[in-house]
């Protein structure tokens, strides 16, 4: 590998989640901010939490004139 072209790797980078959870990892960044982590992600918590990007489901339902009863 050539010297001087690779970014500096930090072994103790603090990761902050929107839920308040923090943990450390390794990265070329000095600090990381994430929206969802293993403490608040529905897959790991078992709780149902809707993460809808811009109301895409509602947009789809309106486009095809569907209601919740039609889908079930």
Curated annotation (Swiss-Prot):
Its cofactor is Zn(2+). GO terms for biological process: translation. One of its GO terms (cellular component) is ribonucleoprotein complex. SUPFAM superfamilies: L28p-like. Zn(2+) binds at residues 17, 19, 37, 40. This is Large ribosomal subunit protein bL31. Belongs to the bacterial ribosomal protein bL31 family. Type A subfamily. Part of the 50S ribosomal subunit. HAMAP family: Ribosomal_bL31_1. GO terms for molecular function: metal ion binding; rRNA binding; structural constituent of ribosome. Binds the 23S rRNA.
């Amino acid at each position: 590998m050539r010297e001087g072209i690779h970014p500096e790797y930090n072994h103790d980078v603090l990761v902050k989640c929107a839920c308040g959870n923090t943990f450390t990892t390794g990265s070329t960044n000095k600090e990381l901010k994430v929206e969802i982590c293993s403490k608040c992600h529905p897959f790991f918590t078992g709780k149902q939490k809707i993460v809808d990007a811009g109301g895409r489901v509602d947009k789809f339902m309106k486009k095809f004139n569907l209601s919740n009863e039609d889908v079930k």
